[in-house]
Amino acid sequence: MWFGKVRFSDKLFAKVKIDEMVESPGMKYKHYAPKTRCILVKSAENQIRKINDLVLQNNNCCVLGFLEDEKYINIPSNRFINLGRKNNLKEISSNIFSSLTKLDKMGCELAIIEGVEESGLGLSIMNRLVRACEYNVM
């Protein structure tokens, strides 16, 4: 995978087996992963619909999403964790750790996480979220 003139390993988003040799330590272990089961919903035209479908199917869930999308997601406000503004990837990246740690305190069985576009800083954000969700991605 190429990002400008930089080539990323094809294993960047691949699940790594525990006994597999990796290119860097950050590829093998979970970092900032909550105990709460998580699903990451990739950025797409139908992202909000997918999130709302998951909310309907799961009574005890919460959503980590973007400020401007909160009004479109059918979940009580006390079950919504604001990651920041969709167009402010720096804000989102600085909120990931605290947002993931809030999940376990909320007592939800499932966390549905709104993903960002996989380019620029968004690539790094998605890599972190994919690993936090243990590769459970829609």
Where do the protein language model's features map onto the residues?
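A C-terminal functional module that forms or caps the active site or interfaces directly
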Residues: 23-134, 138
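Long, charged amphipathic helices and adjacent flexible linkers at domain junctions
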Residues: 9-29
